[in-house]
Amino acid sequence: KVNPERAKQWAEEAVASGVIETEDQEIGFINSVTGGGNPLVEIWNSWSDTRLGAGYEQVLRAYNHPFLNMLFEKNTRIVNAKEPNNTLEAGTKVCGILAGAHVGQEQGSTSNPYNGFSQLNPKAMGSAPLYLMKLSEVCFLRAEGAVRGWNMGGTAKDFYEKGIREANVIDRTLQHRSLRQKYENAVDNYLTIESATPFTYVDPTGNDADRVSQITVGVKWNESDSKETKLEKIITQKYIAGFPNSLEAWVDLRRTGYPRLFNMLNMADGDGSLSDGAMVRRLPFPGSTDDATLKEINETGLKALGGPDKQGTRLWWDVNAPNF
């Protein structure tokens, strides 16, 4: 949006110079090579530090995506143990936490009702690589470029469908062939989905109101779709395939507005620059309590930022303009 011609030039130059086109070229920490396991499993499951987000759950349920039950476990502990009339027994369903929810400070399943929400499936994610750049991401980037009329070396449809086929996050070795086969067996039918399945999120704790999913686009590629609809399909599937790379997903969300996620809760907890329905556009500068750093922020940082040091200030590339 900032400079479409420059974006086109650089994207076409990148493709002409060579980009990731095979699984062997993917970049990341491959645990079957480096040894050890995926640290996210330790962080999620052992430390009880992280749980599935309702936004990701929403998108997976919209398409009955294989990842829902492949990558995540049903609530492994009781949810809302202190509320006998509103308790979700362990092993009932895959459930995520709404962004912005007040989850409490304790980590015990009795003291914190959110502790029992869905963890990672260690069988699928225990040896999953930590990808820095996946083949699927490159495919979706090229699909978007093709929709914009750039020379990406192929069609948007072909790149889009290949991105979905290459979305698997598990280890690519034969060690987990059965899990990989499970995903591959589901892809052909997945690519024919015409529209999203309606979904209403119900908070198992009862703390927050029900949320109706705003995702309506299907998976199937239709050449008759508008450019905007094609972009929404690409970014929505890219969001699924990119798990657990949340930073890349946040960039796309700010850049395009997709996928259509639930609004964040408790916006008043922010720095006053965010209204209901908005999202965090950036992280404020760190170290603002240090005199030297604060001086640097005031003299150069704010000038480069072009706005106040707030969560709602857009970065230079985050332009409030149509996608096309």
Language-model-detected regions and their locations in the chain:
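Long, compositionally biased
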Residues: 263-271
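Extended ligand-binding clefts on enzyme/binding-domain cores
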Residues: 7-139, 146-264
